Amino acid sequence: MSIVKIKDKTFKTSIPEAEILKKVQVVADRINKDFEGKKPVFLAVLNGSFIFAADLMRMITIPSEISFVKYASYEGTSSTGSMKTLMGINQNLAGRHVIIVEDIVDSGFTMAHMIEELKKMNPASVEICSLLVKPGNLKVNLDINYAVMEIPNDFIVGYGLDYDCLLYTSPSPRDKRQS
């Protein structure tokens, strides 16, 4: 088991890279099938989703577009419950099929906020594609049709997920050790 220390926390490998990539391919195959002929727009939520979005987009075989948005709702390891838009949507999405690409759906507040904003733009559809989902921690009702995997309510770093803005780019996510 590989262990890494970031600031004051210690993390251990929780999901091997090969397992993630295999499951990302399964989700990409579903999206390719479900959106064939629809030219979806992928909206990747920065910073955490950038590695997942890159891997996913390499597996997408249908014509599509990608754009990026950035929100802030975390301080350290905790969600603040409030949402700050740091980089918003600057594209006409009317009549388009939109797929939000997120690193992790925890409380669901970021996704609920994004969906509310997107609906004002009259898209044909809005779907959520998340690398990780914490179903036991969801505070809002969301339809997450493209989840790579569900995890318990652990704090995870790696594969683009950060701890207090300190990025850990290990290809395998790690969860916080109890110490």
Label every model-predicted segment.
Residues 84-157, 161:
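PRPP/pyrophosphate-binding module of the type I phosphoribosyltransferase fold
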Residues 30, 43, 51-88, 98-99, ...:
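A generic "structured core" feature
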Residues 168-175:
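Conserved small/polar residues in nucleotide/adenosyl-binding loops
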Residues 38-46:
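Short glycine-rich phosphate-binding loop at a beta-alpha junction
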Residues 3-5, 12, 34, 58, ...:
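Short secondary-structure boundary/capping segments
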